[in-house]
Amino acid sequence: MSTRQPGTLAVHAGHEPDAATGAVAPPIHLATTFRHGPAGERLAGYEYQREGNPTNDRLREALKALEGGEEAMTFASGMAAMATLLESLPAGARVLFPDDCYTGLRMLFAEFLPERGIVPIEVDMADLDAVRAACAQPLAMLWIETPSNPLLKVCDIAALAALGHAAGAVVVADNTFATPLLQRPLALGADIVMHSTTKYFGGHSDVLGGALVFARNDALAQRVAHRLHVTGGVMAPFSAWLTLRGCRSLGARMAMHCANARAVATFLSTHPRVARVNWPGLPAHPGHAIAARQMRDFGAMLSIQLHGGRDAALEAAGRLRVFTNATSLGGCESLVEHRASVEGAHPRSPQDLLRISVGLEDAGDLVADLAQALG
């Protein structure tokens, strides 16, 4: 594992000068097929784009360096990464997952994985006693999301990893909100890290992707890789190139994202129309001490809950001018979303909640926009 700091790794990992030309920016290899010998022997290590190409391999090297893993795989989306991993489990596998989590993960557990005989078990991952009770029976996998979406719960990765391993589970951590610039779950005991690279890795709201980073290149990693190559949910080379380019500015962007989030959260925490601010950087947050221990900074995602319920939340969202009402997160622009309105017929998010992705605008402009929207 490299001794360099994550910000340095983000700039250099996967960006070695091109061997053929000396170019300091990596080329994009768009070829779908590669020349092989008469008997099918691979002459340069590649055969068909679905099974690998040089651009994706550069991104894989960057991901391994940033998360400190032995193996990494890139996918067409974060959902493809999650589905490929979970569908690699055998029938009858029991999977512990968080009560507050990404809607797409919840949909997999509710609609698709039970068809394969996989048994999902929902638990509050911030409650170690509840997790300990759920681990009384053997588990195949324990899924962590911290900070969580959209309530920004903080889970103790090291403690959960110990409980999961004692129950026989592979421990997976969704590190999308934090990125390896702020948090490195493998170093805390997790076995696999999952990312929607669409978010902070891409960083510009213009490229879809997902990734898995494995602490060890073990049998499960090889099974997932085989499934990826056969089922074809791979990341396209141009998407890999855009994501790799995003890596180079990840450290600078995350620093500004976090600074802006602190300014926004501090302002909102004293506003009379705001009932609750969910951001782990606030000392009043129930997970603040854990976040301070396992994170370098507290991230740029937060949510607020307003006095006046759904109507007040929608009114405030509609009055914003610098913030854009849109889904997703991690781009340069600040976004706001009434999550309950986009979660379908049976939303889990509170009706009074707005999720906020704090972008890279001037912090003063963001605070002023929130001030005028809240009145």
Predicted regions span which residues?
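Positively charged, small/polar-rich N-terminal and surface patches that mediate targeting and assembly
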Residues: S2-G7, A13, P54, R276, ...
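Conserved PLP-enzyme active-site core in the AAT-like
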Residues: S2, H12, A72-R273, N278
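PLP-dependent enzyme catalytic core of the Aspartate aminotransferase-like
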Residues: V119-I121, A133, R253, G318, ...
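Short, well-ordered beta-strand elements within core beta-sheets of diverse protein domains
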Residues: T243-A252, G299-H307, L354-G359
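N-terminal "arm"/small-domain region of PLP-dependent enzymes with the aminotransferase-like
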Residues: M1-N53, L59-A62, L354
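Conserved small-domain helix->loop->beta segment predominantly found in fold-type I
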Residues: R262-R321, A340-R348
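Conserved N-terminal alpha-helix of the aminotransferase class I/II PLP-enzyme fold
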Residues: T33-A83, S88, G104-E111, P350
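A common structural junction motif
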Residues: T231-G232, R319-S328, A373-G375
